[in-house]
From Swiss-Prot:
PANTHER family for this protein: CYTOCHROME B
Compartment(s) where it occurs, according to its Swiss-Prot or TrEMBL record: Mitochondrion inner membrane
Record membrane topology: Multi-pass membrane protein
Additional note from the record: Heme 1 (or BL or b562) is low-potential and absorbs at about 562 nm, and heme 2 (or BH or b566) is high-potential and absorbs at about 566 nm.
Keyword RNA-binding: no
Positions bound to heme b b562: H83, H182
Function noted in UniProt: Component of the ubiquinol-cytochrome c reductase complex (complex III or cytochrome b-c1 complex) that is part of the mitochondrial respiratory chain. The b-c1 complex mediates electron transfer from ubiquinol to cytochrome c. Contributes to the generation of a proton gradient across the mitochondrial membrane that is then used for ATP synthesis.
Originating organism: Uroderma magnirostrum
Comment on bound cofactor: Binds 2 heme b groups non-covalently.
A Gene Ontology cellular-component term: respiratory chain complex III
Protein name: Cytochrome b
Assembly, per entry: The cytochrome bc1 complex contains 11 subunits: 3 respiratory subunits (MT-CYB, CYC1 and UQCRFS1), 2 core proteins (UQCRC1 and UQCRC2) and 6 low-molecular weight proteins (UQCRH/QCR6, UQCRB/QCR7, UQCRQ/QCR8, UQCR10/QCR9, UQCR11/QCR10 and a cleavage product of UQCRFS1). This cytochrome bc1 complex then forms a dimer.
Binding annotation for a ubiquinone: H201
Length: 379
């Protein structure tokens, strides 16, 4: 009798994706982040669902409802901090996942890569709207500043901003619609994840060498299921430690002050995971130019496959490209630091230099070094 997991209409889909899936034998721990992102999404949807049962999306009661969750709801504090810090873990895994794709040349699977970029935008939008919901000072002013950027769009900008706000300022209508979209988007993200996996399983996984691994495949279960479970345990240990020992480490103290439209905080800044893009936005003195640079800082990932001119797929055997890649990582850390600093000397010039370097490395230096390495291969 044939095994039920191979014949049942639903089970055979799961079987072909997670059990009998042929996987390259050389996958390193850098390939763990896809499954870790799945766990993060599950944690966020579950904790978010329970938080939504107690949260009220009204400007008069939103801040108090979050306080009520923390003080009066059984384990409400745990749910709230798991959700807030879960977002940070989500972005850590997300950036490492994208970094892995850049380093090992996974972007040559263009459909999977493009769906991944779409997922990145969707998760960023979800996180931004979620940050507005507690209705603290940074929530309110963050929402005001970031949505106001759309007014830089010629001709329709002002109308577009007022349409998003649902009025002439960030108010009750804005909060209600942000809550609705923040609840809806994770399910759209989950659907996009399915499409992401569908395209990935069409081509099979890349591997650290960048060389086709068809002659050397192993079943996903038990080898990579065990490896993934170890990854889950490490990540959940890190998340639990953050939540239980220093839950406010990555947050902003200003968000414990109720939103006040009449009092602007001295330094308006988004959550840490958006600071690199915020630094790029601020480094350009023109509003429209800043907005374009902000969008391009993420959208630039879409042209990376076009800029790949190397004869080798992975950077594993390309030391010059490796140096450039780690310089790019250093630039991103610098931008993240600058995004959290006030707009004054010397931070302005450091931010502008780092922003120029960011685009220069990806658009010009990476392809140039790849061509140099191609030339060196002939020697």
């Amino acid at each position: 009798m044939t095994n039920i997991r191979k014949t049942h209409p639903l089970l055979k889909i799961i079987n072909s994706s997670f059990v009998d899936l042929p996987a390259p034998s050389s996958l390193s721990s850098w390939w763990n982040f896809g499954s870790l992102l799945g766990v993060c999404l599950g944690v966020q949807i579950l904790t978010g669902l329970f938080l939504a049962m107690h949260y009220t999306s009204d400007t008069a009661t939103a801040f108090n409802s979050v306080t009520h969750i923390c003080r009066d709801v059984n384990y409400g504090w745990l749910l709230r901090y798991l959700h807030a810090n879960g977002a940070s873990m989500f972005f850590i895994c997300l950036y490492l996942h994208v970094g892995r794709g850049l380093y090992y040349g996974s972007y040559t699977y263009s459909e999977t890569w493009n769906i991944g970029i779409l997922l990145l935008f969707a998760v960023m939008a979800t996180a931004f709207m979620g940050y507005v919901l507690p209705w603290g000072q940074m929530s309110f002013w963050g929402a005001t500043v970031i949505t106001n950027l759309l007014s830089a769009i010629p001709y329709i900008g002002t109308d577009l901003v007022q349409w998003i706000w649902g009025g002439f300022s960030v108010d009750k209508a804005t909060l209600t619609r942000f809550f609705a979209f923040h609840f809806l988007l994770p399910f759209i993200v989950a659907a996009l994840v399915m499409v992401h996996l569908l395209f990935l399983h069409e081509t099979g996984s890349n591997n650290p060498t960048g060389i086709p691994s068809d002659p050397d495949m192993i079943p996903f279960h038990p080898y990579y299921t065990i490896k993934d479970i170890l990854g889950f345990l490490i990540m959940l240990t890190a998340l639990s430690s953050l939540v239980l020992f220093s839950p406010d480490l990555l947050g902003d103290p200003d968000n414990y002050i109720p939103a006040n439209p009449l009092n602007t905080p001295p330094h308006i800044k988004p959550e840490w995971y958006f600071l690199f893009a915020y630094a790029i936005l601020r480094s350009i003195p023109n509003k429209l130019g800043g907005v374009l640079a902000l969008v391009m800082s993420i959208l630039i990932l879409a042209i990376v496959p076009t800029l790949h001119v190397s004869k080798q797929r992975s950077m594993m055997f390309r030391p010059l490209s490796q140096c450039l890649f780690w310089l790019l990582v250093a630039v991103l850390f610098t931008l993240t630091w600058i995004g959290g600093q006030p707009v004054e000397h010397p931070y302005i010039i450091i931010g502008q230099t780092a922003s120029v370097l960011y685009f220069l490395i990806i658009l010009i230096l990476m392809p140039a070094i790849s061509l140099t390495e191609n030339y060196l291969l002939k020697w």
